[in-house]
């Protein structure tokens, strides 16, 4: 059984032939991906990763060091790489997923059969926006409001925001300090998901994810902004489910 603090598995599946590990954006949680479970192929088991500092782990200290997070999360994931698997990450989750796969390769662990990079500039691009993680509270909240991913009722709830701020600042610390070096391409197929109106992720920078993979590459662009994974969730689910179904047919038919 999976280590429950780290993994939310809405539909455990002992007969699964493929696992999908899902990683959320900065400030997000496993809840983003739970609706996916009802619409994926029957032979796919969805594993939504829940990091410390949010959801049921709200009382735990969040990570501010991406390298340490990768090492600790990788250790939790290792026993569950016994099936072919894919990784889906949105925004910060894409970069976290990429660093996990780099770590797996270094450790000579099984690599994913597919990687979904969603709503993120390619990992060799460093964040060029003015850092926000150390802003005074009011200014920090205003920046969050400008991003559009946090409900207004949450931003206006002072008590709730007091609980969330350590996690939010920690996530943005990792986001704003991350830049991956160019390394040999990963032997893995890639799907790039993006928002046509995502002002923070130019499509050219999004498509440059393909520089980091040497497998087949496909692109799906949605008519949304940065948080298209929330605003266009049904379409994202359909795109992911279709790709996973093709993987099961093409790559796992003889398993």
Positions of PLM-derived features:
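Domain-scale detector for complete catalytic domains at protein termini or as standalone homologs
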Residues: 1-88, 95-255
């Amino acid at each position: 059984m999976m280590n429950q603090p780290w993994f939310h598995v809405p539909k455990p599946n002992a007969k699964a032939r493929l696992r999908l590990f899902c990683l959320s954006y900065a400030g997000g949680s496993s809840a983003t991906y739970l609706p996916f479970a009802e619409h994926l192929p029957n032979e796919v088991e969805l594993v939504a990763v829940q990091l410390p500092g949010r959801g049921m782990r709200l009382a735990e200290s969040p990570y501010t060091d991406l390298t340490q997070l990768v090492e600790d999360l990788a250790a939790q994931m290792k026993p569950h790489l016994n099936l072919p698997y894919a990784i889906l990450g949105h925004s910060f989750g894409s970069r976290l997923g990429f660093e996990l796969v780099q770590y797996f390769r270094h450790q000579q662990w099984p690599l994913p059969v597919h990687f979904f990079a969603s709503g993120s500039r390619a990992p060799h691009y460093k964040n060029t926006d003015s850092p926000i993680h150390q802003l005074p509270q009011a200014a920090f909240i205003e920046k969050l409001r400008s991003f559009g991913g946090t409900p207004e009722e949450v931003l206006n709830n002072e008590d709730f925001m007091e609980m969330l701020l350590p996690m939010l600042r920690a996530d943005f610390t990792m986001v704003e300090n991350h830049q991956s070096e160019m390394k040999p391409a990963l032997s893995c197929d890639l799907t790039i998901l993006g928002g046509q109106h995502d002002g923070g992720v130019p499509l050219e920078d999004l498509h440059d994810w393909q520089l980091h993979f040497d497998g087949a590459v496909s692109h799906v662009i949605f008519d949304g902004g940065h948080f298209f994974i929330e605003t266009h969730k049904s379409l994202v689910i359909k795109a992911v489910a279709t790709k996973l179904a093709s993987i099961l047919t093409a790559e796992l038919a003889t398993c």
